[in-house]
């Protein structure tokens, strides 16, 4: 876990000083009220974006207080990973009086900016969000929010405040060690082609770097876009093995497509793991229902959610 102390929250005065106009004018611009010239409006909005200032939607005497909400920002609800994380967060917050409120970004940096802006305007008691890679605007908002910020799932980078997760580079590297140690050399990779899925990218980088240290390169790779599914795993496995039938191992970027690949290979009579080895990533419960075990890496999703919630709730420093 990496930590860094947050700064004090920004105020209208900060935006006023940065833009060179009065606090009253700043307030009118940010609330979209009153007659303000286009040039002044742009000057104020630019200063607010640069500083990371988010207007406070809580009125009157409550304006200096925080609400009993924890903003949870995740990239997706369509896979099996983040519901487990949310379960851990919810379970840990259950006796604290804090309630998680979820925003989904669909792996879009601009969408993450918008979700964070809206959530921070209600002055939550903390923020939990996935990953360490964010836009400059998002980092500015979080860095100046003056509340606990926990970035989850990844520790390969510098956190804004606190990071809780695993090293994906190490996960990829250690899987390569296991595969090479078992004697496999003709290795194929099947994974997502999403530039904003930074954790999958880091795992693959760690995997390939360790292979290279042993003089081995990926013999084939197959990428897909969009969500993961068993059917997609079947299709991609058929495609890569039709093109490169002498592969002796397939490394999948997640368990869902890995499970689909395993089922396809079993239906066609592959000797697993003798003729062909397979591995995925995440350690999801789905694997327990398969007729054969798929090698995987446990990403500790529930534990990550629980620890992030403990930090936001002040149970753990």
Segments (PLM) and residue ranges:
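N-terminal helix-turn-helix DNA-binding module of bacterial transcription factors
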Residues: 1-68
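Amphipathic helical "hinge" segments at domain boundaries
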Residues: 38, 42, 51-118, 122-126, ...
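Hinge/beta->alpha junction and helix N-cap segments in small-molecule ligand-binding domains
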Residues: 75-84, 102-111, 164-174, 190-236, ...
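Flexible loop/hinge segments that line or gate small-molecule binding clefts
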Residues: 107, 130-174, 256, 282-294
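Short, well-structured alpha-helical segments in soluble
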Residues: 110-123, 231-246
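Periplasmic-binding protein-like
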Residues: 123-131, 188-191, 223, 244-254, ...
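Short acidic capping loops at alpha-helix termini that bridge into adjacent secondary structure
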Residues: 186, 218-221, 272-277
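Flexible loop/turn connectors
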Residues: 243-317
């Amino acid at each position: 876990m990496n930590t860094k102390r947050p700064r004090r929250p920004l105020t209208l005065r900060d935006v006023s000083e940065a833009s060179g106009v009065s606090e009253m004018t700043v307030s009118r611009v940010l609330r979209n009220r009153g007659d303000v010239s286009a040039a002044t409006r742009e000057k104020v909005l630019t200063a607010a974006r640069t500083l990371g200032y988010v207007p406070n939607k809580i009125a009157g005497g409550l304006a200096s207080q925080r609400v009993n909400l924890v903003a949870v920002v995740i990239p997706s609800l369509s896979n099996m990973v983040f519901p487990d994380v949310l379960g851990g967060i919810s379970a840990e917050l259950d006796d604290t009086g804090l309630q998680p409120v979820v925003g989904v970004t669909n792996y879009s940096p601009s969408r993450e900016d918008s979700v964070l802006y809206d959530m921070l305007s209600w002055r939550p008691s903390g923020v939990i969000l996935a990953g360490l890679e964010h836009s400059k605007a998002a980092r500015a908002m979080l860095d100046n929010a003056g509340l606990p910020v926990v970035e989850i799932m990844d520790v390969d980078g510098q956190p804004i405040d606190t990071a809780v997760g695993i090293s994906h580079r190490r996960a990829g590297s250690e899987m390569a060690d296991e595969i090479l140690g078992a004697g496999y050399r003709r290795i194929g990779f099947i994974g997502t082609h999403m530039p904003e899925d930074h954790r999958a990218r880091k795992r693959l980088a760690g995997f390939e770097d360790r292979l290279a240290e042993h003089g081995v390169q990926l013999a084939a790779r197959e990428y897909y876009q969009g969500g993961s599914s068993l059917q997609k795993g079947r299709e991609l496995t058929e495609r890569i093995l039709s093109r490169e039938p002498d592969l002796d191992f397939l490394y999948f970027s997640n368990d869902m497509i890995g499970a689909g690949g395993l089922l396809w290979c079993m239906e066609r009579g592959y000797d697993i793991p003798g003729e062909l080895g397979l591995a995925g990533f995440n350690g999801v419960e789905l694997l327990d229902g398969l007729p054969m075990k798929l090698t995987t890496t446990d990403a500790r999703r529930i534990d990550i959610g629980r620890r992030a919630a403990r930090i936001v709730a002040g149970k753990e420093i």
